[in-house]
From Swiss-Prot:
SUPFAM superfamilies: Bifunctional inhibitor/lipid-transfer protein/seed storage 2S albumin. Pfam families: Tryp_alpha_amyl. This is Non-specific lipid-transfer protein AP10. In germinating seeds, detected in the entire surface of the cotyledons, shoot meristem, inter-cotyledon space, primary xylem and immature vascular elements (at protein level). Expressed in seeds, but not the aerial parts of the plant. Keywords: Antimicrobial, Disulfide bond, Fungicide, Lipid-binding, Membrane, Plant defense, Secreted, Signal, Transport. Plant non-specific lipid-transfer proteins transfer phospholipids as well as galactolipids across membranes. May play a role in wax or cutin deposition in the cell walls of expanding epidermal cells and certain secretory tissues. Permeabilizes the membrane of fungal spores, inhibits germination of the spores of the fungus F.solani at a concentration of 40 ug/ml. Inhibits the growth of F.solani with an IC(50) of 6.5 ug/ml, weakly inhibits the growth of the fungus A.alternata. Binds oleoyl-CoA. GO terms for molecular function: lipid binding. One of its GO terms (biological process) is defense response to fungus. GO terms for cellular component: extracellular region; membrane. Residues 1-26 form the signal peptide. Induction: By salt stress, abscisic acid (ABA) and fungal infection.
Length: 116
């Protein structure tokens, strides 16, 4: 009986731990560039984005749930784009090519601090 009570207590603790809300982890520039690395051939030269590129772009969009995350992602992308020789026209067309709907403007002149 003592073993059964201990087992139930442990099981209850495991269930409670799984039900706890885990704090969200803020997005980093490594997350942004890592998710978009498969897109570099498209972002530099055009053509058609690969399935891996679109999957990374969708993953990045899913990771930017908060205003702070969206602004961080914007700032990271703006910093990295010139260094990686990303064409602005290709960057702005990527969401549409991947079937992604976003209200975030994608252009080199966007003020990241105004993104909702």
């Amino acid at each position: 009986m003592k073993g059964t009570s201990m087992g139930v207590a442990i099981l209850a603790m495991i269930v409670m731990a799984q039900l706890m809300v885990h704090p969200s982890v803020a997005i980093t520039c490594n997350d942004v560039t890592g998710n978009l690395t498969p897109c570099l051939p498209y972002l530099r030269s055009g053509g058609k984005p690969t399935p891996a590129c679109c999957a990374g772009a969708k993953k990045l969009l899913g990771a930017t749930r908060t205003q702070a995350d969206r602004r961080t992602a914007c700032k990271c992308a703006k910093t990295a784009a010139p260094q990686l020789k990303v064409r602005p026209d290709m960057a702005s067309s990527l969401p549409g090519k991947c079937g992604i709907s976003t209200s975030i403007p994608i252009n080199p002149n966007v003020n990241c601090n105004t993104i909702p």
